[in-house]
Amino acid sequence: MNQDQLKQLVGQKAVEYIQDGMQVGLGTGSTVKFMVDALGERVKNEHLNIVGVSTSDRTAAQAKALGIPMKSVDEVDHLDLTIDGADEIADDFQGVKGGGAALLFEKIVAINSDKVMWIVDESKMVHQLGAFGLPVEVIPYGSQHVFEKMAARGYNPVFRKVNDELVRTDSNNIIIDLHIDPITDPHALAEDLIHMVGVVEHGLFLDMVNTVIVGHANGPEVIEARP
């Protein structure tokens, strides 16, 4: 199985957990795209009555095109389940997210969810976080000073660019990717980053995920990370 087939596998498995009447957070990224496709099929074929809440403009556009009823996060009192991808998941089920530059909205939706599920192919399961760059969302104003503070701490920051243009988030902020390998104390790092003036949010998703579905060639593995 290639990587896309593994992603499709876990996406299809994840939608089995969505029940009639649920308010569901829809993540962002290549794996989630397969999940949203599968959810659209269930809505169409089973007349599944659910409401989706998106973590990005591109997921919202995909869901609407598939006929999935959508609301904004501020229009729902809670979310029953959020299904999202992850860039890295460590042995203790701490995660790094934000490769798709949607980490702020993803975290807002996740913390307002009763349950959080991450769907990944097996390459995303690691012993310790850090090989994947850690995304940090910062406001543009003063971002060079934030960058220099990060560099002084030894975080090896890099402004994220595509075609020599700064990547912009859906909130029009920018992303600084940190290269800290390994991340030995993610909780301490998270505290340090969130207290830097100009930092909006970081891509450490700690003590948050309940269920992880991992795509293997022999089928999806469902792991209960925490109650």
Swiss-Prot record:
SUPFAM superfamilies: D-ribose-5-phosphate isomerase (RpiA), lid domain (SSF75445), NagB/RpiA/CoA transferase-like (SSF100950)
Domain of life, per lineage: Bacteria
Enzyme class: isomerase
Keyword Cell membrane found: no
UniProt KW Isomerase keyword: yes
Molecular function terms from GO: ribose-5-phosphate isomerase activity
Positions of substrate binding: 28-31, 84-87, 97-100, 124
Reactions that this protein is recorded to catalyse: aldehydo-D-ribose 5-phosphate = D-ribulose 5-phosphate
Alphabetized CDD domains for the sequence: RPI_A (cd01398)
Sorted UniProt keywords: Isomerase
Residue numbers annotated as active site: 106 (proton acceptor)
Pathway: Carbohydrate degradation; pentose phosphate pathway; D-ribose 5-phosphate from D-ribulose 5-phosphate (non-oxidative stage): step 1/1
InterPro entries reported for this sequence: NagB/RpiA_transferase-like, Ribose-5P_isomerase, Ribose5P_isomerase_typA_subgr, Ribose5P_isomerase_type_A
EC number: 5.3.1.6
Any Pfam family: Rib_5-P_isom_A
A GO BP annotation: pentose-phosphate shunt, non-oxidative branch
Subunit-structure text: Homodimer.
Record's function text: Catalyzes the reversible conversion of ribose-5-phosphate to ribulose 5-phosphate.
Family: Belongs to the ribose 5-phosphate isomerase family.
Protein name in the entry: Ribose-5-phosphate isomerase A
Organism: Lactiplantibacillus plantarum (strain ATCC BAA-793 / NCIMB 8826 / WCFS1)
Lineage: Bacteria, Bacillati, Bacillota, Bacilli, Lactobacillales
Designated gene of the protein: rpiA
